[in-house]
Amino acid sequence: MSSHADSKPWTVPALAQAKRDGRKLVMLTAYDAGFARTFDANGVDLILVGDSLGMVVQGHESTLPVTTADMVYHTAAVARVLERALLVADLSFQADATPERALDAATQLLQAGAEMVKIEGAGHKLDVIRYLVEREIPVCSHLGLTPQSVLRFGGYKVQGRGEAGEQLRRDAQAAVDAGASLIVLECVPTPIAAQISAELRVPTIGIGAGPGCDGQVLVMHDMLGLDSGHRRPKFVKDFLAEGGSVAGAVQAYAQAVRDGSFPDAEHAYAA
């Protein structure tokens, strides 16, 4: 467990300080109090209540059916037990379609206990990010493979190869300029993710984006080797197999992120 996690709760400014200090950030999803409590006690710095709950908890084929009410319910359950980890919650599909709708949904999530909201995509979402930050709501920008755009992408595919990598770099910088305090990069080639991470002043969290990011996140079911009913992505590693228990798996995952052994080339995408 990191020295920070041993001493005091994480805050948004502390995330930027961790990047400056070269300290890797450990993030996991959680959707209920029991797992959240275990993750919080075993070295996880940030917990994401993700709309991935639509697939791994509710059994849907995508995240699209998840509602703001679903997100509020699970966010509140997780928030009640956290002592150190910073809590991030997703804005569900189309909850951020306009700045006003995003403010309503984000307000509900913060009232439920979230400390930051995550928004997928760039483009017109930059206005949403700016609108929320101007109203004192911390924002995480999710770029690369954005699951809410799965229909447009034609499936879950690596993003940012070739010329698209340069656009991804521009999108990441634009999100930070709009006020984002954290960037999630999903299914992005390792060299591009590393370049983006080096260029930005805020931390990047990778999921299938290689070891050059400032931290890593996995869906808890993937980290524990549970069958989610969907094809396992290349970047997934079962830490329960080596950890022997849920707490042991979390500790093994956290240590691997911090010492840089996860993700390795086997769990990342080349250019």
Curated annotation (Swiss-Prot):
One of its GO terms (biological process) is pantothenate biosynthetic process. Belongs to the PanB family. It comes from Xanthomonas campestris pv. campestris (strain ATCC 33913 / DSM 3586 / NCPPB 528 / LMG 568 / P 25). Catalyzes the reversible reaction in which hydroxymethyl group from 5,10-methylenetetrahydrofolate is transferred onto alpha-ketoisovalerate to form ketopantoate. NCBIfam families: panB, PRK00311.1. Transmembrane segments: none annotated. CDD domains: KPHMT-like. Its cofactor is Mg(2+). Homodecamer; pentamer of dimers. Mg(2+) binds at residues 51, 90, 120. It is found in: Cytoplasm. 3-methyl-2-oxobutanoate binds at residues 51-52, 90, 118. Binds 1 Mg(2+) ion per subunit. Pathway: Cofactor biosynthesis; (R)-pantothenate biosynthesis; (R)-pantoate from 3-methyl-2-oxobutanoate: step 1/2. Its EC number is 2.1.2.11. Gene3D superfamilies: Phosphoenolpyruvate-binding domains (3.20.20.60). PANTHER family: 3-METHYL-2-OXOBUTANOATE HYDROXYMETHYLTRANSFERASE. InterPro entries: Pantoate_hydroxy_MeTrfase, Pyrv/PenolPyrv_kinase-like_dom, Pyrv_kinase-like_dom_sf. The active site is at 186 (proton acceptor). This is 3-methyl-2-oxobutanoate hydroxymethyltransferase. Disulfide bonds: none annotated. GO terms for molecular function: 3-methyl-2-oxobutanoate hydroxymethyltransferase activity; magnesium ion binding. It comes from the Bacteria.
